[in-house]
Regions:
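Structural preference for solvent-exposed beta-strand-turn elements
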Residues: 1-386
Length: 386
């Protein structure tokens, strides 16, 4: 096999391909890029770690067709430092790969293409097309609340659903939950405006990699989703991302959201986050090998008092608020609270709560012009020590 790549094209392709490279070092082929070259100028590049993978088709001058696997990390490093505009990759019958550009050359050992794990074939008429920036934005609001090694496997990922023309995303663990729903320009796979209801759970590692791949400043860019019971494919221009799905029924999240709270607090989101970041100097300080992560909030009239104390010091701040209902004292894991506030994309927010021991809801303020989506972020408090 012999291929001549343009340096800018192959470098642009390698970066997203790394999303599908295995880091567990269990199978050598999953640490590599499968290169499949066919005459006259088509080159297909694939990475796959058994759980998720990326495939790209790029233009290249194919002098001799063939296929092989090269180390992803070494190949990406080599093509990045090559000086010439063109990079020539040659792989001989002994699986010796030679990479040449200008006066520079590198050699490395390749693997036969037959060693690459078989990629699941997905034949499905179920799916939809949506704006990339909308899907990415909804993922950004919910990713922080996904479970990690939760005993309930369905919580170790991001739940997507399409119903009544709306796209929903939900994530949840034992302490926090994020939900987002928005009406957007969805299309069926046949190009029509009729979209069948659908739902799936994408594993958290796949969520993180897909989020990177969806990054596109062009708001007209689309992502097309094809799904089956066990697997899913996202097509974004020249990039195809495929992943296994988490099987099982997602929790009935609407049932656990408390709606009728008797206390409402209205405040500036950035000002609140700034005060909590000050408190984080105390809450995230290690004392005797452990981290004291709780922050205490006291809503009294038109002031929210924020305090944190450890064996080495304390922090105190105040934020002006609008306040409906009784005064209250409540405590939270400070980092969870900050993450929830960062996910709520609004200038002013509403916090609804009832007691120091029940969950709170964080939402964009109803009067906020930025609040076009149906976003809700729920967080459980922690029990305060006397």
């Amino acid at each position: 096999m012999k291929i001549v790549f343009r340096k800018d094209i192959i470098n642009a392709a390698v970066a997203p391909l790394m999303s599908g490279v295995s880091t567990k070092m269990t199978l050598a082929a999953t640490e590599g890029i499968l290169i499949e070259a066919s005459l006259p100028n088509v080159c297909v590049l694939t990475t796959y770690d058994i759980e998720k993978g990326v495939r790209m088709t790029i233009e290249a001058d194919v002098i001799e067709a063939g296929s092989a696997i090269v180390s992803a990390s070494k190949f990406s490093q080599i093509v990045r430092v090559m000086d010439g505009n063109d990079i020539t990759l040659t792989i001989d019958d002994r699986n010796c790969a030679t990479i040449v550009s200008g006066r520079s050359s590198h050699t490395m050992t390749a693997l036969p293409a037959k060693d690459f794990p078989e990629i699941p074939r997905l034949v499905s008429s179920q799916g939809f097309t949506a704006p990339r920036h909308i899907v990415r934005g909804m993922m950004a609001k919910c990713m922080y609340a996904m479970g990690v090694n939760d005993q309930r496997p369905v919580l170790n990922g991001l739940f997507f659903s399409v119903s009544n023309g709306k796209l929903h995303t939900v994530s949840c663990d034992s302490f926090k939950m994020a939900t987002c729903a928005t009406e957007t320009d969805l299309m069926g796979l046949d190009g029509s405006e009729t979209v069948e209801d659908a739902k799936f759970i994408l594993p958290n590692k796949s969520v993180s990699e897909l989020y990177k791949l969806l990054n596109d400043k062009d708001e007209d860019s689309l992502v097309t989703v094809y799904m089956s019971r066990k697997n899913i494919i996202f097509v974004m221009g020249d990039i195809t991302f495929f992943s296994k799905l988490i099987e099982g029924e997602y929790i009935d999240y609407n049932r656990i959201i408390l709606r009728n709270h008797r206390i409402k607090i209205f405040l500036d989101r950035e000002e609140f986050i700034s005060a909590l970041e000050h408190a984080a100097l105390i809450t995230e300080e290690k004392v005797a090998g452990s981290v004291r992560s709780h922050v205490r909030l006291e809503a009294e009239g038109s002031v929210l008092k924020i305090s944190a104390t450890s064996g080495t010091g304390s922090a105190y701040d105040e934020v002006a608020i609008g306040h409906e209902g009784d005064d209250i004292v409540i405590a939270f894991n400070n980092r969870y609270l900050i993450d929830s506030l960062r996910a709520c994309n609004a200038d002013r927010i509403k916090i609804s709560l009832s007691s120091p021991l029940t969950s709170i809801n964080i939402e964009p303020n109803d009067d906020d012009s930025c609040a076009t989506d149906e976003d809700l972020f729920m967080l459980l408090p922690v029990r305060m020590k006397d």
